[in-house]
Amino acid sequence: MKYQPLYDRVLVEPIQNDEAHGKILIPDTAKEKPTEGIVVMVGGGYRNDKGDITPLKVKKGDTIVYTKWAGTEIKLESKDYVVIKESDILLVKS
């Protein structure tokens, strides 16, 4: 992939929660947005108050939980991703 998130942004591959709801088929428009994902790429960091670059705490491969309305959904090379700010990440799973 030839893309790179900028600053404090993180490229995330959402983890779809495809739990069965009995025999009811739920259309895509009614499904909950995923709030878990795998970090694919991270930006270079953000500038702190002193002007220094502060690297991000998350890294490629981390499984994260992020806020429901975080980021921008994009499609790259036929795959769905979300670009979010590190501040929208609530948890890193270990």
UniProtKB/Swiss-Prot annotation:
The record's subcellular location field reads: Cytoplasm
Single GO cellular component annotation?
cytoplasm
Name a Pfam family for this protein.
Answer: Cpn10
Question: What interactions and quaternary structure are annotated?
Answer: Heptamer of 7 subunits arranged in a ring. Interacts with the chaperonin GroEL.
The similarity annotation says: Belongs to the GroES chaperonin family.
What this chain does, per the record? Together with the chaperonin GroEL, plays an essential role in assisting protein folding. The GroEL-GroES system forms a nano-cage that allows encapsulation of the non-native substrate proteins and provides a physical environment optimized to promote and accelerate protein folding. GroES binds to the apical surface of the GroEL ring, thereby capping the opening of the GroEL channel.
Question: What name goes with this protein?
Answer: Co-chaperonin GroES
Per the UniProt record, the source organism is Orientia tsutsugamushi
Gene expressing this chain: groES
